[in-house]
């Protein structure tokens, strides 16, 4: 489900555009546009991320690294680790770090941003689960 980048808008509706730019030895370069609201401030994030998969017997790990020269993020990394939890279940560990390359009003502190990112992570994990159970669902 998650390996097919074109599924991202179905997984999380905040993702409005996905385009695979390049596939190379170092991974896939993927362009995305994401509409995010933090508090009362909404912003479109555009980014090119290099996506690399690492697979072994125990886990599947997708790592994303933002290319700041082609994004409105100064820095960004993400890691999605999927492990088998038995009984046809997978567990997901998601970690991300981002630094925007645009002004954020001082009233929006780190706590508000973390809360918004946590909400997006939950929406994404629920979307992965929904799509895994019902591949034809929107």
Region spans (language model):
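Beta-strand/loop substructures that line and gate deep hydrophobic ligand-binding cavities in soluble
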Residues: 46-47, 65-119
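Hydrophobic pocket/interface hotspot
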Residues: 1-2, 8, 51, 92-94, ...
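Glycine-rich portal/gate segments that line the openings of hydrophobic small-molecule binding cavities
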Residues: 19-71, 123-137
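Generic helix-packing signal
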Residues: 2, 82, 100, 125-128
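Hydrophobic ligand-binding cavity/cleft-lining segments
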Residues: 1-26
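Residues that form generic nucleotide/phosphate-binding pockets
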Residues: 1, 115, 131
């Amino acid at each position: 489900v998650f390996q097919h980048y074109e599924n991202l808008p179905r997984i999380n509706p905040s993702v409005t555009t996905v385009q695979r730019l390049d596939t190379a030895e170092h991974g896939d370069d993927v362009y995305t546009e994401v509409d995010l609201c933090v508090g009362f401030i909404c912003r479109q994030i555009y980014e090119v991320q290099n996506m690399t998969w690492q697979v072994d017997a125990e886990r599947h790990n997708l790592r994303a690294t933002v290319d700041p020269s082609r994004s409105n993020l100064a820095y960004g990394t993400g890691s999605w680790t999927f492990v088998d939890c038995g009984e046809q279940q997978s567990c997901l560990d998601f970690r991300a770090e981002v630094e925007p390359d645009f002004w954020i009003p001082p009233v929006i502190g780190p706590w508000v941003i973390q809360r918004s990112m946590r909400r997006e992570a939950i929406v994404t994990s629920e979307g992965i689960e929904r799509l895994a159970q019902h591949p034809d669902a929107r």
